[in-house]
UniProtKB/Swiss-Prot annotation:
Function: Participates in cysteine desulfuration mediated by SufS. Cysteine desulfuration mobilizes sulfur from L-cysteine to yield L-alanine and constitutes an essential step in sulfur metabolism for biosynthesis of a variety of sulfur-containing biomolecules. Functions as a sulfur acceptor for SufS, by mediating the direct transfer of the sulfur atom from the S-sulfanylcysteine of SufS, an intermediate product of cysteine desulfuration process.
Pfam families associated with the record: SufE
Lineage, opening ranks: Bacteria, Pseudomonadati, Pseudomonadota, Gammaproteobacteria, Enterobacterales
UniProt cross-references to PANTHER family, sorted A to Z: CYSTEINE DESULFURATION PROTEIN SUFE, SULFUR ACCEPTOR PROTEIN CSDE
Gene for this chain: sufE
Native source organism of the sequence: Yersinia pestis
HAMAP family named in the record: SufE
Oligomeric form and interacting partners: Homodimer. Interacts with SufS.
A cellular component annotation (GO) from this entry: cytoplasm
Name of the protein: Cysteine desulfuration protein SufE
């Protein structure tokens, strides 16, 4: 997660944005900080269904049992939302990710009411897919 802020800094930075245009630009900037995916990570099994844009999310377990994320999207704002999700789940174990309800966090940022319905549905699809995949990660 090199380059991405931690959860508290994300909230601080987001609150400093004066309007939604600045917040969107900040989200896009976060997406630009994601490391590029390898061709292997762009495998169809990492493609998230339910998103209007193409979204890939790859996950592995660290030696300490924390989930390591890699992701990308063909849409700049969605790539930024991927980065926001990764910030929320950073340094967590599969069980912690499954237990964590991120919806209140999105409500605090007022993301839900400022995203189009299709983007909100895509965000929900991303969260569901991550929870399903981490459950499979911890089972292996």
């Amino acid at each position: 997660m090199a380059g991405l802020p931690d959860r508290d800094k994300l909230i601080r930075n987001f609150s400093r944005c004066l309007n939604w245009e600045e917040k969107y630009l900040y989200i896009i900037e976060l997406g630009g900080q994601l490391a590029p995916l390898t061709e292997q990570q762009r495998h169809p099994e990492n493609l998230i269904s339910g998103c209007q844009s193409q979204v890939w999310i790859a996950m592995t377990l660290s030696a300490e049992g924390h989930v390591i994320f890699a992701g990308d999207s063909d849409a700049a704002i969605v790539k930024g939302l991927v980065a926001v999700v990764f910030i929320l789940y950073h340094d967590l174990t599969p069980q912690q990710i499954i237990s964590l309800d991120v919806r209140p966090f999105f409500a605090d940022l007022a993301l839900s009411q400022h995203l189009t319905p299709s983007r909100s549905q895509g965000l929900e699809a991303m969260i569901r897919a991550i929870r399903t995949k981490v459950a499979n990660l911890s089972a292996h």
